[in-house]
């Protein structure tokens, strides 16, 4: 097995990586003390989870993708809710679940790409279920997210512009999932996979301008 291209890049650019880690860590610590206590506690718990992953948690099958989806969805939605003292209602829970499923789904293609590297180290969904079934799992989660968005719209918890932006995002995510395979170049995953988060914001802005 060859060395993972992302690992090779990190090794070659380790000084830059270390500098960015120190800078972002220092800045994060600076703003950490401006948050409320409950927000700080959640951040600490997420930090402990991320810290334990490479030492003990990674031995648990499928835990990597769960940790990624949990940390991403929590930091981009739940922390904002807690910090602004927004009451966590059914609507907020549904939104968090939909975001968790979305992140979970778009992370599966990265595990497909890493199949040859993860074989000896970690049990992932594509390794256990195969590529096609993994894509079906991702599709199922994305369709659940669409269902949640439609449900929220029907209960007046979501405006039309938000609904259309989310549906477009989820369908593009579906295309990304089904076009993914282990032979795709690294740039495909870096551009489309990582870029979906930016697309979510762009779709929302465009949808609000139109509707």
Residue ranges of model-derived segments:
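Solvent-exposed interhelical
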Residues: 1-22, 100-143
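Membrane-interface helix-boundary motifs at transmembrane edges
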Residues: 2-10, 33-36, 57-60, 86-90, ...
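Intramembrane alpha-helical segments
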Residues: 9-83, 176-179
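Helix-coil boundary and interhelical linker segments in multi-pass alpha-helical membrane proteins
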Residues: 27-41, 76-97, 148-161, 205-211
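Hydrophobic core segments of alpha-helical transmembrane domains in multi-pass membrane proteins
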Residues: 39-50, 94-101, 162-170
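Functional transmembrane core segments of multi-pass inner-membrane proteins
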Residues: 65-116, 136
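Glycine/small-residue-rich hydrophobic helix-like segments
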Residues: 125-174
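Extended hydrophobic alpha-helices typical of membrane-associated regions
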Residues: 163-211
């Amino acid at each position: 097995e060859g060395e993972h291209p992302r690992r090779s890049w990190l090794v070659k650019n380790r000084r830059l990586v270390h500098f960015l880690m120190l800078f972002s860590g220092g800045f994060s610590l600076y703003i950490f003390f401006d948050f409320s206590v409950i927000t700080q506690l959640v951040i600490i718990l997420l930090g402990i989870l991320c810290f334990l992953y490479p030492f003990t948690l990674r031995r648990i099958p499928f835990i990597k993708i769960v940790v990624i989806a949990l940390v991403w969805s929590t930091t981009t939605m739940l922390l904002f809710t807690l910090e602004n003292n927004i009451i966590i209602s059914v609507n907020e829970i549904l939104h968090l679940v939909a975001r968790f499923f979305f992140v979970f789904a778009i992370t599966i293609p990265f595990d497909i790409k890493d199949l040859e590297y993860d074989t000896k180290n970690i049990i992932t969904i594509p390794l256990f279920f195969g590529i096609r079934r993994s894509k079906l799992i991702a599709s199922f989660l994305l369709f659940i997210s669409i269902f949640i968005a439609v449900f929220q719209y029907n209960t007046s918890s979501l405006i039309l512009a938000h609904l259309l932006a989310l549906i477009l995002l989820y369908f593009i995510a579906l295309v990304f999932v089904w076009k993914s395979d282990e032979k795709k170049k690294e740039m495909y995953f870096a551009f489309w996979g990582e870029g979906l988060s930016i697309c979510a914001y762009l779709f929302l802005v465009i949808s609000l301008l139109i509707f």
